[in-house]
């Protein structure tokens, strides 16, 4: 429920923020297109991460959490792509991003693990994954967007925070 509310707020902010022309890339500023492209990349990576547990988790709650995470990010990616299309923005996800590194690390950490060892590791990685995206969004991304995109970045943080809180509940089971 919390994730759905955060997701709706985030999508709402994206839907109602004014359409912006592409900004020149100076002083590390992200244009609307670059911001949406970054978020699209992060959604794809998060879906790939979630699918690791969808296919390999032994615990039903872990599988369900992974399915919910994949679905939430899939829905968000689709909405983001529709908004970009409506605004005539061409998304070009960055080649490398924090989420790319996180995905590589997760695959490496989960390699060879099965059963409870896999589940426990994935849940901890999921919590760390979301925490890292929240911190990066707050410290790096928000510092690089103009005031007109701050609501989008803030709603994205809130949306991720709700997912993190849900994952934290599951994490307690594996302590």
Mark where each language-model region is.
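Bacterial N-terminal signal peptides
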Residues: 4-16
